Amino acid sequence: MLDPLDILTNIDDVLPYYQAIFSAEEQKVVGYEVLGRILADSEIQSLGPFFLDAGIPEEYKLEVDNRIIRQALDRFLEADSDLLIFMNQDANLLMLDHGESFLELLKEYEAKGIELHRFVLEITEHNFEGDIEQLYHMLAYYRTYGIKIAVDNIGKESSNLDRIALLSPDLLKIDLQALKVSQPSPSYEHVLYSISLLARKIGAALLYEDIEANFQLQYAWRNGGRYFQGYYLVSPSETFLERDVLKQRLKTEFHQFITHEKKKLETVYEHSEQFYKRVHQAVTSLRKNNLSSDDDFIKKLAEELTDCSFRIYMCDEEGDQLTGNVFKQDGEWIYQPEYAEKNWSWRPYFLENIMRMRNLRKGFFSDLYSDLETGEMIRTFSYPMDDQMYLFIDLPYSYLYEQDGLI
């Protein structure tokens, strides 16, 4: 890293770079993130390490940051009047004067022609060391001026979703650095799913950053990304781009994503239809045997479905379990009576799925999820026996893996 004193001595060589942010809706540049750079030893170097170094005095950082911002805003004065301006700020430094000096700087440029609603203030929640309530009040004050708030680096380090929800940002920036392989870990998928749910609840848009490959762009598109940023799209530059520079390319890639996703959904639907026919046939056949109890019924059904299931049970429409479990352990079916009378209505989508079965009168697969007891990625097939009784069949990962399109 460059010596901080060298940076201050050569502050005239500090300059802003701009990384374009693209819209999923219009496939065009909607704004730029302002990044700090310095010309040193005849090459452009990032100032990221300088700003992240806790040992560098605050006044040094503020001086360099102020120069970068002023140069950038002078450039935005000459650009399209609807471009969003994303600026990283250290929340700890902002709180030194409760954000007043930074706000005054933005107001100065408002007077020159940049409307305040174009500014997006990026902060990193997990780096903030002060009182989160005070930070919330400062950001709420900023928002009264129309300034947007983005919480940055989500997914890169430990982010506190409660604190993020309290800050109520306009955007959540999700870092895809952890997505370095084409098949992300289930736990990472779950974290991003939780973040997407939070975004929906608090009305925040998702911006995926650090996109460095096609599969990461596809992942961001599939997981609710409204905005995209990263080297796979464009590298940071000293100049602005034509706003439609990637429009045709993004249209082509999105079309490929849509085609792939439609095919995948059709495959799951076809598997669901075939599995429904198999279960329906088995249930109809077993009902003719007049078995003495529902527990005997699911034991017999387990034998019929032994190649594709590892747990079977029945519940009523309120989630009360009417049978025990039949559970496959070490390749053998065992009966678990202790599960009878447990209630599962608290589980996500349980009641929604009950109503869906009641109305459609058909069975269907759940999404892929992690089983609470085994930790294995599974799907559940839900089947309506009648208006009062519903059958649940858990399918193991080993079976799903063998079926095209169920993973």
UniProtKB/Swiss-Prot annotation:
Disulfide bonds: none annotated. It comes from the Bacteria. PROSITE patterns: EAL. GO terms for cellular component: plasma membrane. Residues 1-250 form the EAL domain. It holds the Pfam family EAL. This is Uncharacterized EAL-domain containing protein YkuI. The gene is ykuI.
